[in-house]
Amino acid sequence: MPTPPVSALVAQMGEGPAPLYARVKQMIIQQIDNGSWPPHHRVPSESELVNELGFSRMTINRALRELTADGLLVRMQGVGTFVAEPKGRSALFEVNNIADEIAARGHQHSCQVITLTEEAAGSERALALDMREGQRVFHSLIVHFENGVPVQIEDRYVNAAIAPDYLKQDFTRQTPYAYLSQVAPLTEGEHVVEAILAEPEECRLLQIERGEPCLLIRRRTWSGRQPVTAARLIHPGSRHRLEGRFSK
């Protein structure tokens, strides 16, 4: 189905009493709902919408910001605004492989390894991993992508004594989760979930606007009685949600 030009959509907005930004939102939602703008479709830029619709940049910006906050659009810094995929889901009470979660949605997983180093544990890492300060830990920083869109920063510290070959692995071929499940099978996990505003470097890696809300999961895992890893998992709020079910 060919995508109609923005100028052809103006007539669909109607007059009505609704504020101008709300009418712009409704026009965009209509294009998404009827399939004219499918997931990953590039939305016209603010300048294009201003020129075509004749509304102020402030009006257009508010409409796009609110649709992004609602999870219908994804704004990628320096690239543009796109129709979002339905949000990726993770189980709140489970520890899963992100590559498997993405594959289960019928999508392609890829990743970029930013950091893979050995460090001496500072007080925070030593406490999290139940070790002495100065002991060896491995640090990996990896960005995970779903169909080419960044969906998670994985900032992980690993007890080097438990996984001594961690730095030798090619994590573009298997995730840290998959490797660690082989050498130190998970017996216990801990999740702490927070809403945060991403730091500038995190925004750059996730290709989001500065100050965009993100979901932070602090995860620790054990194999037997020994903590194996402590990780920070950062997801853009517009691209991810957590689900959980429990019985009493």
Swiss-Prot record:
Gene3D superfamilies on file: Chorismate lyase-like (3.40.1410.10), Winged helix-like DNA-binding domain superfamily/Winged helix DNA-binding domain (1.10.10.10)
Name of the protein: Histidine utilization repressor
A Pfam family per the record: UTRA
PANTHER family per UniProt: MANNOSYL-D-GLYCERATE TRANSPORT/METABOLISM SYSTEM REPRESSOR MNGR-RELATED (PTHR44846), TRANSCRIPTIONAL REGULATOR PHNF-RELATED (PTHR44846:SF16)
Pathway noted in the entry: Amino-acid degradation; L-histidine degradation into L-glutamate [regulation]
Domain HTH gntR-type positions: 18-86
Gene that this polypeptide is encoded by: hutC
Known function: Repressor which binds to the hutP region in the histidine utilization (hut) operon. It blocks the expression of all the hut genes in the absence of inducer.
GO BP annotation list: L-histidine catabolic process to glutamate and formamide; L-histidine catabolic process to glutamate and formate; negative regulation of DNA-templated transcription
Top-level division of the source organism's lineage: Bacteria
